[in-house]
């Protein structure tokens, strides 16, 4: 062997190998699924590249993966005649993990083995799963179309390093030999291998063949042991739920069953087949900016690309699956997809299909839908801003916490809310805050509790942004309870003659507060919306809200200053006390204290908390 060298694994690979061997052992047979899946991908890539360069087939266009075993040497070998790898590709693919966020992800995994296996499965272990059952793995590979003497040898015991060298390999493709650990003899058994392949790889289009030796004359033949027909090309009636689930695990590299799926063949103006899955759990890097998503794209059953994100809007980036189009050209590129009318029509149809799946799930199985919402609700909340044409459908799928349930769980639909609206109630009331606890205890809710009116409690960072696009539902406008609004005044019975008289008596007090605060507030007024709180701050309907200003700040953007309306409760003892103070210095202390209290309740912070504490201490000891 030429060019031999020993190289160290990237630290993340070492971590992954250690975690995987320990946490996936109870489900160890998946190594076969992962390795056959990789061989299937290699075959897909070769077919695609050969569309423009048929010479890559090297006279052998019958693609397959073969399994053989040697009981004496205790080895299991998988060999494919797919795309193969160059030396640089071997180093990149087998020595490093090129996923951003990998280090943080691996560090976050603890010692809970059941949880770890799910997380690592979610991560996609691929080739490294071989080390679950092998104490040494040998790889021999050559890239399609490259000279025989550019083959590559790779070997490792799955510890700190690996050996790589140049070899001569006549056949293109990749051969992986697993030197099995003690106690793994079950994978040297013909029946056991057939059983695992039938379970995990029956649905893939690549033929999987097993070596059959004639006991009498020692001749070797190869027997195909899977159906080797692309699952999505079969009729729905022929496919079992278990086959659909197994195919999901193959394309998503996930260990868990999907929540739901939809398999459709469409004929007419456009002809295509789609198989779409809703996963049961979010991928570990779903919120990573570099997160890859999208569908597998096939054209006339020929694999074209992974992660074709043009067919699904970003807020549905969690959807896995594939589309097989008869209308797109075989030489389609990502750039062509971007501008294609066919792509836009497919995207629209597939988006509607996913939303229908979610509607059906919500209607038929509320518990499963709640599981979906916990995993992907935050992504779906991006929908009203991103997809105006489906806004009403998305709105029906949203779930919220509410004063009706007295729980932080987001289980209330807008249809639920509307069905419980009080007689004469014209608006859907909501509040946004930093946390569920802050929303639930906000003084803005006092009037609504008194009147028995339900309020939606929104505390996810995205909520304020979402509500700026979600303006109404079934003809009912949304109204933030922290905004000044005439409908809130009506609720508070502001026209009551006794209240008007009390307000008149306090007019000099209100003017005095206005003079003191000046430009720091937009207005000072009395309110009857409060029962237990002396004062609140609100914003005008056309003003930026507190939560939106926080969003701007979190994004590093300069937000316009929020000008609050300072509203005082004339029936509260502290306001009455402040109104009686004649000394200007003490009066200023009272007003500043009431304003700080209102700002603290609204924003959760003060610009000068120490001043607030000093002022409170002075008034308490006065």
From Swiss-Prot:
Location of the protein in the cell = Cytoplasm
Q: Which GO terms describe its molecular function?
A: ATP binding; ATP hydrolysis activity; ATP-dependent protein folding chaperone; unfolded protein binding
Major subcellular location class: cytoplasm
Which domain of life does the protein's organism represent?
Bacteria
Question: One matching Pfam family, short form?
Answer: HSP90
Annotated region described as C, given as residue ranges: 551-622
Question: What are the recorded Gene Ontology BP terms?
Answer: DNA damage response; protein folding; response to heat
* A GO cellular component annotation in the UniProt record: cytosol
**The keyword Ribosomal protein appears for this protein:** no
Q: Which InterPro entries match?
A: HATPase_C_sf (IPR036890), Heat_shock_protein_90_CS (IPR019805), HSP90_C (IPR037196), Hsp90_fam (IPR001404), Hsp90_N (IPR020575), Ribosomal_Su5_D2-typ_SF (IPR020568)
Region described as B: spans on this chain: 335-550
Key words, A-Z: ATP-binding, Chaperone, Cytoplasm, Nucleotide-binding, Stress response
Q: Does the keyword Disulfide bond apply?
A: no
- Annotated region (A) at 1-334
Q: Cite the record's note on assembly.
A: Homodimer.
Q: Could you tell me which NCBIfam families the record lists for this protein?
A: PRK05218.1 (NF003555)
Which family would the database say this protein is a member of?
Belongs to the heat shock protein 90 family.
HAMAP family, alphabetically? HSP90
Q: Outline what the protein does.
A: Molecular chaperone. Has ATPase activity.
Query: How is this protein named in the record?
Result: Chaperone protein HtpG
Q: What is the lineage of its organism?
A: Bacteria, Pseudomonadati, Pseudomonadota, Gammaproteobacteria, Enterobacterales
Which gene carries the instructions for this protein? htpG
């Amino acid at each position: 062997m030429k060019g031999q060298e020993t190289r160290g694994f990237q630290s993340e690979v070492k971590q992954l190998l250690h975690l995987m061997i320990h946490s996936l052992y109870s489900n160890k047979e998946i190594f076969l699924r992962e390795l056959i899946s990789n061989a299937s991908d290699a075959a897909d890539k070769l077919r695609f590249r050969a569309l423009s360069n048929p010479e890559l087939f090297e006279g052998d266009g019958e693609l397959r993966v073969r399994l053989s075993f040697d009981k004496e040497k205790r080895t299991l070998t998988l060999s494919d005649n797919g795309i193969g790898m160059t030396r640089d590709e071997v180093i990149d693919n087998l020595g490093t993990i090129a996923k951003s966020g990998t280090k943080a992800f691996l560090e976050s995994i603890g010692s809970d083995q059941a949880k770890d296996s799910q997380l690592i499965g979610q991560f996609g272990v691929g080739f490294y799963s071989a080390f679950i059952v092998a104490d040494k793995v040998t790889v021999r590979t050559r890239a399609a179309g490259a000279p025989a003497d550019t083959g590559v040898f790779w070997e490792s015991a799955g510890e700190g390093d690996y050996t790589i060298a140049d070899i001569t390999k006549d056949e293109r493709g990749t051969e992986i030999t697993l030197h099995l650990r003690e106690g793994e003899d079950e994978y040297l058994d013909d029946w056991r291998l057939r059983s695992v392949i039938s379970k995990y790889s029956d649905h893939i289009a690549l033929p999987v063949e097993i070596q059959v030796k004639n006991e009498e004359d020692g001749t070797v033949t190869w027997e195909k042991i899977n159906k080797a027909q692309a699952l999505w090309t079969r009729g729905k009636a022929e496919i079992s739920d278990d086959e659909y689930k197994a195919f999901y695990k193959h394309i998503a590299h996930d260990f868990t069953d999907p929540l739901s799926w939809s398999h459709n063949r469409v004929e007419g103006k456009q002809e295509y087949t789609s198989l779409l899955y809703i996963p049961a759990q979010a991928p570990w890097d779903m919120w990573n900016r570099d997160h890859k998503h999208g569908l597998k794209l096939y054209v006339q059953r020929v694999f074209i690309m992974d992660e074709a994100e043009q067919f699904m809007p970003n807020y549905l980036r969690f959807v896995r699956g594939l589309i097989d189009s008869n209308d797109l050209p075989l030489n389609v590129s990502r750039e062509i997809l971007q501008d294609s009318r066919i792509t836009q029509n497919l995207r629209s149809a597939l988006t509607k299909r996913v939303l229908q799946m979610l509607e059906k799930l919500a209607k038929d199985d509320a518990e499963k839908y709640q599981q979906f919402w916990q995993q992907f609700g935050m992504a779906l909340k991006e929908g009203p801003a991103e997809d105006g044409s489906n806004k009403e459908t998305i709105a029906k799928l949203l779930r919220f916490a509410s004063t009706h349930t007295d729980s932080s769980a987001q289980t209330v639909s807008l249809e639920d809310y509307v069905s419980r609206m009080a007689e004469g109630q014209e608006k859907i009331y909501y509040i946004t805050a930093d946390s569920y606890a802050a929303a639930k205890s906000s003084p803005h809710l006092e009037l609504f509790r008194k009147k028995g009116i339900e309020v939606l409690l929104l505390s996810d960072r995205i909520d304020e942004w979402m509500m700026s696009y979600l303006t109404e539902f079934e003809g009912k406008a949304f109204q933030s309870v922290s905004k000044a609004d005439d409908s809130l005044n009506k609720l508070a019975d502001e026209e009551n003659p006794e209240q008007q008289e009390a307000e008149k008596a306090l007019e000099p007090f209100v003017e005095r507060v206005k003079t003191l605060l000046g430009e720091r507030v937009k207005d000072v007024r009395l309110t009857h919306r409060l029962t237990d709180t002396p004062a609140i701050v609100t914003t005008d309907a056309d003003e930026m809200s507190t939560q939106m200003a926080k969003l701007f700040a979190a994004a590093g953007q300069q937000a316009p200053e929020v000008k609050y309306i300072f509203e005082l409760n004339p029936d509260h003892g502290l306001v009455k006390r402040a109104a009686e103070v004649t000394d200007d210095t003490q009066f200023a202390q009272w007003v500043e204290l009431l304003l700080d209290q209102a700002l603290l309740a609204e924003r959760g912070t003060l610009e000068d908390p120490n001043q607030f504490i000093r002022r409170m201490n002075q008034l308490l000891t006065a």
